[in-house]
Amino acid sequence: MNANVKTFSFDRKKVKAGILHFGVGNFHRAHLEFINSQLLETGPDMYGWGICGAMILPQDERIYNVLKEQDGQYTLTVCGRDGNNEAYVIPSLIELYWGYRDQEAILNKIADPAIRIITMTITEGGYNQEKSTGRFMLDDEKIRHDLGDPKHPVTAFGYIAEGLRRRRDARAGRITILSCDNLQHNGDTARRTFTAFIEAQDKDLAAWLKGNVTFPNSMVDRITPATKPEDVKRLNAQNGTRDMAPVYAEDFIQWVVEDNFAAGRPAWERVGVQFTDDVTDFENMKLSLLNASHTLLSYPSFLSGYRKVDEAMHDERIVRFVRAFMDKDITPYVPAPKDTDLEEYKQTLIERFANRTVSDQIARLCFDGVSKFPVYVMPNLIKMIRDGKDLTRVTYLLAAYRHYLKYHIDDRGISFEIDDPWLTDNDKELIASDNSRAFLHLSPFQSTDLEQSDNFSAQYLMFVDAIKEKGAMKTLEAII
């Protein structure tokens, strides 16, 4: 290990788990684990807040085995916008279980009075909601399994319900469930979906839940690319390490949390976490500017032949497109949170997207558009249609999304595979249709009838034809 790889000096052997985390993916390891390692460094009074990881998916086996072999530790490389990187050994993950090997251990951990917070990164799609209504889908195959076989769960809902049942029976006390997923009102979403599942399974437990579990909202932010095999080699060479589970992320990090904890909490404010009574303005700013802009640039950039975000954001045409979207389409609907300079925030976003040392994959941004459009794009689009705003950039985006899903080929003639796992059978029929209007009835757009807006429909149809005839970039050039 190179001398410049930083280590934390707290006594790891004295740290006990006070947090159980579901979903030990790259973002969690670059965000909460980094924050918590910094917290543990502040003093022994925080040693009761180590993290126990719970991995419950079949595909988690490889990374579980690697992390177990590495005693839960790994390197995080923080990539500076100035081109300078800093690497850390992250030690706050002190226990780790995989559901296909350690199911009882995970369930009993939820019932352990030492565990006072359950955190989660289970992705936008993991909350099992119908895209257009937000209804919890009780007819999902895995959900039906967990409803019928509570003691052998396969979903986060099943695990947490059975664990809470044991916690209640053991009189182990109240607990907080804290979503760290990139959803607006993620705590409200968690409360609604977990309540729906538990009410369908055990009404007595549902009554206990209401009085003993809190679900704070939180806003998380740190761009964390997927780590590919070539990244593993590069990071190990750069850091002088032999780490089979490294992660890398940008230098920006933010976490804003509603201060609503049922059984105490770590003093995360010591290391820069912002606590507030209401995270709404922070959520709106981040989801409407960062996430919506990511979606806006993803499909046009990918169709134009770009594969890395930083490369696309060094194309002045795309920068102008994204900045116009931020300034003209989004800013009128985003009140700045207290003590936040919105102009500075937008400029920082442009710099973050262009960070060459992070070099995020555009394919990651394109992934699961069905889950992203309802959260990041549709709320403001509905307001824009209502207010008679210029719809040029958003209609172009939807036309580009259709082209991406339908034709699987970019402007250079290079074919690609799409990755949108939540497309329904009906969605696939609408995409395959030669009637371009049919696409406007795709499941992520069902919160409003886009076809009823003549202005929207006309512009969208024009861009559908233009992208097919001239390509995504040539079409974009005409509107910036």
Predicted regions and their residues:
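Substrate/ligand-engaging "lid" and interaction regions
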Residues: 1-480
